[in-house]
Amino acid sequence: MLEGLGSPASPRAAASASVAGSSGPAACSPPSSSAPRSPESPAPRRGGVRASVPQKLAEMLSSQYGLIVFVAGLLLLLAWAVHAAGVSKSDLLCFLTALMLLQLLWMLWYVGRSSAHRRLFRLKDTHAGAGWLRGSITLFAVITVILGCLKIGYFIGFSECLSATEGVFPVTHSVHTLLQVYFLWGHAKDIIQSFKTLERFGVIHSVFTNLLLWANGVLNESKHQLNEHKERLITLGFGNITTVLDDHTPQCNCTPPTLCTAISHGIYYLYPFNIEYQILASTMLYVLWKNIGRKVDSHQHQKMQFKSDGVMVGAVLGLTVLAATIAVVVVYLIHIGRSKTKSESALIMFYLYAITLLMLMGAAGLAGIRIYRIDEKSLDESKNPARKLDSDLLVGTASGSWLISWGSILAILCAEGHPRYTWYNLPYSILAIVEKYIQNLFIFESIHREPEKLSEDIQTLRVVTVCNGNTMPLASSCPKSGGVARDVAPQGKDMPPAANGNVCMRESHDKEEEKQEESSWGGSPSPVRLPRFLQGNAKRKVLRNIAAFLFLCNISLWIPPAFGCRPEYDNGLEEIVFGFEPWIIVVNLAMPFSIFYRMHAAASLFEVYCKI
């Protein structure tokens, strides 16, 4: 018996091979382990291991190079922020300009080489660089270019006392932004298989260049917010806990004073969009770096489609929240710092609004998680760098908000005096922690669900179709050889004949497994039936309404901190407990991650909406 299985001349093995080669997914070939391995078969595996060693070294060396550049840039940013001796703003801008020019040279070389070999087949990661993602980065890039134009106008107005680097930097940044968006539109999905070592260094250099530009934008925006906070505290009579205003205004007169003042204020209103652009570009480039030399499977990602039908409830509620958020932010910015009474009323208004919104978001997230858990659909565990990065970013950036919230909770518990508005801060801080936890679970459940097409393919693979060539085949892929059917068919009574001589057999299951499978697929014996989750139109509409509502809510919660509505600065309790400078450092470090979390969560929820 063993010799018969291992013999290549066995008629049963030959028949199985012909069925496997012709029937495709409708037939199952015998396990490959039944055939003896050639003595030379382990050799390619050893060669593959040896070949992968240089690539692992290149990945490690390129990542270390990127970290060195990033750490050097952060130290330069820190030195300029604390006014270190011998470090000026011109030094910082020269360093960032040099990094951008080097990235521009690499992108031009890559685009030129890709254009010269455009007729060659290139592997693509269908999960990376989605259309809505590229559209978002294009919008942020346009605003970043407008920001660069304002900076050029600011330089022209103060050209008498500003160095030339402050004019060269915005020009270089604008050109860098335009070319980078073009590069990401055309090559974000690439899986690079040639010049891999060189490309690793080029891509990782681009990643950390964008991260340094992001850090530079965060630092400038934080300095501006801190100065406004100090001015409000001085107005309210808390000048004893403040330090000297960190003013970087040039020591000369602008040619049109009114225009220069408008430009300087407009610059800081555009910084949030520039910050989002830089971090979004760095994440897309990081996925490109992880995909270098990657071997992709044959499964293609199902293309997501945006459909607006059936989400009226979620969209209306979300747009209502968005309008209410804009109104709250406007009232908050008008009243805060005017007087002690107006500041307290503005804080109470914000806390009540945020508590209500966070409770609604938490309830919506719990409802979505409950629907997924009842559904009991299998998860997609395939390796996906883009999806893994999304999950890591959600957890990592949420930690910034959690740090601020835990600091507020400790300050409330440890403070000696408690103004009335602090008791609204306590439930707000607790809900901020819980809501992000629930929302992350909902997003993880959604993005790891198998798409509809994959589930059908899995069911199809469970059906083995064997056709008799004497009659019309059951499927176009069935072989037309009667001998094959006779050799493959088992000699027993377990396989009932089908009409027209076709024989369709399913995998053998015991009775318990059949009952479980029938109950999980709605009790229908049909092997090709959609999951219960996708059969229920009502459940799908509920999930899409939840995703749409959470998407608009996250956009709404991104607006207040991005445009200066930051109660962590203004309530004053944390500054009294922890000290002014320690608490300001904590807020300035954690706030950028908290702001980015909302935008990234909104992007993930948009993907969830399109996937449902």
Curated annotation (Swiss-Prot):
Entry membrane topology: Multi-pass membrane protein
Bias kind Basic and acidic residues: ranges: 506-518
Chain positions covered by the region annotation Disordered: 1-50, 499-525
Cytoplasmic side: 1-58, 113-130, 189-196, 291-311, 371-388, 445-544, 606-612
Catalytic reaction equation(s): H(+)(in) = H(+)(out)
Effect recorded for residue 570 to E: Does not affect cell membrane localization. Reduction of proton channel activity
Keywords in alphabetical order: Biomineralization, Cell membrane, Cell projection, Hydrogen ion transport, Ion channel, Ion transport, Membrane, Transmembrane, Transmembrane helix, Transport
One Pfam family hit: Otopetrin
Domain of life: Eukaryota
Topology feature Extracellular, residues: 81-88, 154-163, 224-264, 335-344, 414-423, 564-581
Subcellular localization: Cell membrane; Cell projection, Microvillus
Any GO molecular function: identical protein binding
Free-text activity regulation comment from the record: Activated by both acid and alkali, with proton influx in response to extracellular acid and proton efflux during alkali stimulation. Inhibited by Zn(2+); this inhibition is thought to be pH-sensitive. Currents evoked in response to mild acid (pH 6.0) stimulus may also be mildly potentiated by exposure to Zn(2+). Activated by NH(4)Cl.
Role: Proton-selective ion channel. Biphasically modulated by acid and alkali, mediating proton influx and efflux in response to extracellular acid and base stimulation, respectively. Sour taste receptor, which carries inward currents in response to extracellular acidification. Sensor for ammonium chloride (NH(4)Cl) in taste receptor cells. NH(4)Cl acts by increasing the intracellular pH, thereby generating a driving force for proton entry through OTOP1 channel. Might also participate in alkaline sensation.
Domain note: Residues involved in the gating by extracellular Zn (2+) and pH are located in the extracellular loops between transmembrane domain 5-6 and transmembrane domain 11-12.
Family: Belongs to the otopetrin family.
Assembly description: Homodimer. Interacts with STAT1, independently of STAT1 phosphorylation status.
Protein name: Proton channel OTOP1
Organism: Homo sapiens (Human)
The gene coding this protein: OTOP1
